[in-house]
Amino acid sequence: MEITKIELDQKETLDEVFKIYQNSFPANERQTLETLKIRLKEEKEVLFAAKINNEMVGIGFLFDLLGSDFLLLDYLAVKQNHRGKQIGEALFSHLKNYARLQEKHLLMEVDDPEFGDDKPYRVKRLAFYQKNGAFWLKDIKYILPALDGTNPTEQILMLVPKNSKSEFSGEEIKDLVKRLYAELYGISGEDTNLANINSSITEKVVVLPFL
């Protein structure tokens, strides 16, 4: 398996990436393809792809919260007929190494298993991240805005900390969430979801296993 960084001018490869992307995520969690292309052009987003025998089998998007200590794992997906082959683990390991070289925490927005009608899938995804070195930012009730104008998604925040950091100040996490909402979702100022998230952030936020 080969994992490489994909550039905006690789049109045929991008078409393959976007096909996996659209088949892997629900509409309320997907940015438009045009938005992703703009982010790649402006170097706010970094894209990696995994190939086996020249076939695209997995993708990983990282969003750089410039000027902060965080990289967001925006999207990670494996082509449906190639799941269960350790491709996700290999991609995630590659992304962790990239974050380490950038000297940044690798952050994830992960669906909360206490909500939704697909709990087994949510638990499986959360367990995947935990098994591969990610920890939970304790008790934060994160909400992903609906990207298609329908319903928001209840989530938790996880991360692979740099330098084994085990605690953050509440103000640092509030600033992080504010930046996520502004830079990824175009939401700033007063917002009900943002206010609800902030109300769940304590003075000190510890990093723990979730399961």
Locate each region found by the language model.
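Short amphipathic alpha-helix that is part of the acyltransferase structural core
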Residues: 1-35, 177-187
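A conserved beta-strand-loop-helix scaffold within acyl/acetyltransferase catalytic domains
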Residues: 18, 22-77
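A structural signal for short, well-ordered beta-strand segments and their strand-loop junctions
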Residues: 49, 72, 106-109, 136-139
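Conserved acetyl-CoA-binding loop-helix of GNAT-fold acetyltransferases
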Residues: 78, 84-99
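Conserved GNAT acetyl-CoA-binding A-motif
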Residues: 97-120
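Conserved active-site alpha-helix within GNAT-family acetyltransferase domains
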Residues: 113-138
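C-terminal "cap" of GNAT-fold acetyltransferases
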Residues: 121, 142-193
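Long hydrophobic alpha-helical segments typical of transmembrane helices together
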Residues: 183-211
